[in-house]
Amino acid sequence: MSAANDKLPDILQDAVLKASVPVPDDFVQVKGIDYSAATATDMRASDLVNSMKTMGFQASSLGKACDIIDEMRSWRGKHIDELDEHDRKGQFDDAGYQKTTVFMGYTSNLISSGLRETLRYLVQHKMVDALVATAGGIEEDIIKCLAPTYLGEFSLEGKSLRDQGMNRIGNLLVPNDNYCKFEEWIVPIFDKMLEEQEEYVAKHGKDCLDANTDVDSPIWTPSKLIDRLGKEINDESSVLYWAHKNKIPIFCPAITDGSIGDMLFFHTFKASPKQIRLDIVADIRKINSMSMEASKAGMIILGGGLIKHHIANACLMRNGADYAVYINTGQEFDGSDAGARPDEAVSWGKIKAEAKSVKIYADVTIVFPLIVAATFANGKPLPKN
């Protein structure tokens, strides 16, 4: 206490002028960006994010997410030649070293938005190993190959839009004609898939019951259906196209919860009494096996709900992910899975206690392009690990 305050009552000295303990040496000072500095002019994304690490609040979480993603991408284990035959599982880099298996999940609205191009870039360049999406995240990717989505306003009146045949997704507009084009495109594919399925069943009988026995067989699973759509669309703007081309599985356990579900429903009337059958059990075995075989597992979760939990639950099968980055606006006060912080997943064994993890409370369309620019697309060699 300074001499100027030595006449204050003791209660004020104790309450208002309470002394601090010494600050530990490892404390980081809060510091923002000095835009008067020459280095701040036309700053690279990676430099901007690095400067934001000491800013506090969600800016610091964004910086931490970039560090986690860099470590997730750069980790390397043993060379495949050092491993016994039964241990040669999981993902390997081009030089033959073990690397992290990266699971990325995203909700349908992100494909409806311009984030689709960012997600496509990651799949095109094999920067992720498995995807989990909602049904809308599948169909909207295809629909955008057939017709565009437009910018609108959040405030547009629903009744007026309905009268015009315009569907609103936030401040995006999708003409209903787009879904009619989607139906015209997908029904012949369903016809062909049903024909292939029935021919295979007739030929193989009981031997065709296991969808995992022959990954190329027309015993369909949601991921096989999605792969087929990626093959058929044959459009380089599509996430599904690049996932098919690069053999990156896309899992969608709620494949019927969207326009694809409508089309499958309509197709049952056309094809009755036959119908396309999708084996969801084969897909849960596939994604859980990918997790169990991973040398290390990383999660990048864009949004919440089904896509978040499906990846986290797969990582439970290996006693937790090693890296986790969540980006969503969900709050935990209502007990929702979307709102839960990574530490809640630790309690379930879905993220390891010693894992590197962070949650960014933000709109994914704002922060994820910046994260990708600062990490996956920064043009620099991977940090050595």
UniProtKB/Swiss-Prot annotation:
Keywords: Hypusine biosynthesis, NAD, Transferase
Keyword NAD appears in the UniProt entry: yes
Pathway linked to the protein: Protein modification; eIF5A hypusination
Physiological role: Catalyzes the NAD-dependent oxidative cleavage of spermidine and the subsequent transfer of the butylamine moiety of spermidine to the epsilon-amino group of a specific lysine residue of the eIF-5A precursor protein to form the intermediate deoxyhypusine residue.
An MF annotation (GO) of this entry: deoxyhypusine synthase activity
Pfam families membership: DS (PF01916)
Gene3D superfamilies: Deoxyhypusine synthase (3.40.910.10)
Entry cofactors: NAD(+)
Protein's recorded name: Deoxyhypusine synthase
InterPro entries in UniProt: Deoxyhypusine_synthase, Deoxyhypusine_synthase_sf, DHS-like_NAD/FAD-binding_dom
Enzyme Commission code: 2.5.1.46
Matching PANTHER family: DEOXYHYPUSINE SYNTHASE (PTHR11703:SF0)
Binding positions for NAD(+) per the UniProt entry: 108-112, 134-136, 140, 257, 304, 329-330, 363-364
Residues where spermidine binds: 139-140, 262, 309, 335-337, 344-350
